[in-house]
Swiss-Prot record:
Its EC number is 3.5.1.108. It catalyses: a UDP-3-O-[(3R)-3-hydroxyacyl]-N-acetyl-alpha-D-glucosamine + H2O = a UDP-3-O-[(3R)-3-hydroxyacyl]-alpha-D-glucosamine + acetate. One of its GO terms (biological process) is lipid A biosynthetic process. NCBIfam families: lpxC. This is UDP-3-O-acyl-N-acetylglucosamine deacetylase. Zn(2+) binds at residues 78, 237, 241. The keyword Transit peptide does not apply. It comes from Alkalilimnicola ehrlichii (strain ATCC BAA-1101 / DSM 17681 / MLHE-1). Keywords: Hydrolase, Lipid A biosynthesis, Lipid biosynthesis, Lipid metabolism, Metal-binding, Zinc. Belongs to the LpxC family. GO terms for cellular component: membrane.
């Protein structure tokens, strides 16, 4: 059977929050089967647990924020993307501040942490959400959609009127039966425009942003001396974000996602629209690995196929 997964060991890291600029202590811990991904604010007294679920999403300005009462955890999407890419169903994520550390702006450091902790299969069937009917949400010229697909596929189109963004690097569609999340997506960094930085910081956002954890673009060019990690790193980061946002369904997805200029807000609207339309999805498990369109070859390397 395809089993649920958690971490073998706890592991710790330190970083800064992208928007708060605060130092953050992060601890990833194993969790029992059927727990899901639980974010825990250990700096609060008493600590507050916030399940990583679409219905707990509050603020979606520039990042995805989970909330429970007055407690918040911002910028969860890059860590969740790594959890999804490696097939981690259950974990406790402890943070000492209201934000997951940005690390290098990608999911790569989280992939490294999870692999370093080790991945353990649990004695429980892995639960998937399978898309049965198309679901679409729109805002002006932006849209996001789910379609039935026997596997996991993500397509995204971004558009900015800027010389750095071209048709060649503005669209990507990845079928994870033939694409490695770790190799082709996980290292794509978040990006931002210098012209927006002053406005963001005036609103106490992006206080921890730097060339060490983001691709920065002025009116003409990329400012990072080392350039891009992928030719299409911008759109691949949007795919990375979407994978993290989609994992707030609580389970791995069997289906196709397409986004056109969508962001965290529209992604969450799509999840809520899907969950509200009960005949558009179903929860499934697989007793035999050969029956599943998503295969996990061995702990540590999750491959859709």
């Amino acid at each position: 059977m395809i089993r649920q997964r958690t971490l073998k060991n706890s592991i710790r890291a330190t970083g800064v929050g992208l928007h708060t600029g605060e130092k953050v202590y992060l601890t990833l811990r194993p969790a029992p089967a059927n727990t899901g991904i639980i974010f825990r604010r250990v700096d609060l007294d008493p600590p507050v647990d916030i399940p990583g679920h679409a219905l707990n999403v509050g603020d979606t300005r520039l990042s995805t924020c989970l909330s429970q009462g007055e407690a918040r955890v911002y910028t969860v999407e890059h860590l969740l993307s790594a959890m999804a890419g490696l097939g981690i169903d259950n974990a406790f994520v402890e943070v000492s501040a209201p934000e997951v550390p940005i690390m290098d702006g990608s999911s790569g450091p989280f992939v490294f942490l999870i692999r370093s902790a080790g991945i353990e299969e649990q004695n429980a069937l892995k639960r998937f959400i399978r898309i049965r009917k198309p679901v679409r949400v729109e805002e002006d010229d932006k849209w996001a959609a789910f379609e039935p697909f026997n596997g996991f596929k993500v397509g995204y189109t971004l558009h900015f009127d800027h010389p750095v963004f071209t048709e060649q690097n503005g669209f990507a569609e990845l079928d994870f039966s033939s694409t490695s999340f770790v190799k082709e997506v996980s290292r794509a960094r978040t990006f931002g425009f210098m012209r927006d930085i002053e406005m963001l910081r005036a609103n106490r956002l992006a206080l921890g942003g730097s060339l060490d954890n983001a691709i920065l673009v002025d009116d003409y060019r990329i400012l990072n001396e080392d350039g891009l990690r992928y030719q299409d790193e911008f759109v691949k980061h949007k795919i990375l974000d979407a994978i993290g946002d989609l994992y707030l369904l609580g389970h791995s997805l069997i289906g196709a996602f397409k986004g056109h200029k969508s962001g965290h807000s529209l992604n969450n609207k799509l999840l809520r629209a899907l969950l509200a339309q009960e005949d558009a999805w179903e929860e499934v498990t697989f007793d035999q690995a050969s029956d599943s369109p998503i295969a996990y070859d061995r702990p540590g390397l999750a491959v859709a196929g």
